[in-house]
Amino acid sequence: MKKFIFFFKNYCYISGSMLLFSLIDLLLWIISLYCVGLVFWILFVLQCIYFVWWLWKNIFYQLNSFGLVNFVWDNPLSVIIGKLGTGKTLLLTYLSQTMKLLTDEIYSNYPLEDDKVKVLTFKNLDFTDRTKPVPPDDSVILFDESYLYIDGTSPHDEKKVHSGKIPWIVLARHFGNRALFTAQREGMIWNNIRQLASGIIIPISLKKPVIKKGFNFFNRFFIMQIGIFQDITDYEIWKTKSVERTAEGKRVKHKSDVGLGIRFFKIIIPLEFANKYDSQWLKFVRDLKNDEIVNKKEYYWSEITKLSVKERLELFDIDILKKNLKPKKEKGNGKDD
């Protein structure tokens, strides 16, 4: 039943993304009712071409959605790597909805407007912690901004602090957990996770809905192209070759290779999924700092000339200048004049 509901919803999303073309096809059909001869057959052929295109696209996107769900389910550890704005959190949120096809145990470390998604922190995965439990069998764990929790650029230092997470990382598949971690660079992900990850997901491009007055009904979908790799080494090789082709002025190839476990495909993400999370939910951290500041006076640059040199130096807070321009203590004379 879940698969049928998922298929039907996906069908509606995909059909909705092509609604404008469907209206054009309907218009052609209405016109053809009043035409005869060559014009009728031309319109008939155009309708047939549209129908074949619509059917192929619908099947194409349906298979891609099912393929992504199965890929995540088959890999206990996956990482999503992409620069700022490529849609990493959007993809996690999309999976928070589509993975319900296989399980009801969904956890995330960032807020989602979904009553079925549970809160998770890094302590849930720490075996030295005795306050929060490890998620049960068949759980999907969505972990955004992993760099905020573990500094992947300092693996040796982090290993001392986060050694309690290693048992979970190694035994995730035995626990029936499926986890996804995001980062802007592969080097930002902790080495213990990166090397054991059997799923590498790369958001390559993201076509956002264009918000225009009167056309919002036709622009309620994101189209994301992603690449999936089964090993970090395969991804690094592909990335190196892509950089070389770009440097030579050539187009980067997004060609799937089933033998190497490399696939590229597109998925449609409804705008309603994107509205389930706040991309700036961590802005409360700013308030933690600002609430402790007593003097919150701000200056305009036009007011700087009214300050003394010493006040300017204190205001700009340039440590090197403050250190070197600090008045030296005068040495006292050894004997009276």
From Swiss-Prot:
GO terms for cellular component: host cell membrane; membrane. The keyword Transmembrane helix applies. It is found in: Host membrane. Its main location: host cell. Keywords: Host membrane, Membrane, Transmembrane, Transmembrane helix. It is a multi-pass membrane protein. The keyword Membrane applies. InterPro entries: P-loop_NTPase. The chain crosses the membrane at residues 4-24, 26-46. Belongs to the plectrovirus ORF2 family. This is Uncharacterized protein ORF2. It comes from Spiroplasma virus SpV1-R8A2 B (SpV1).
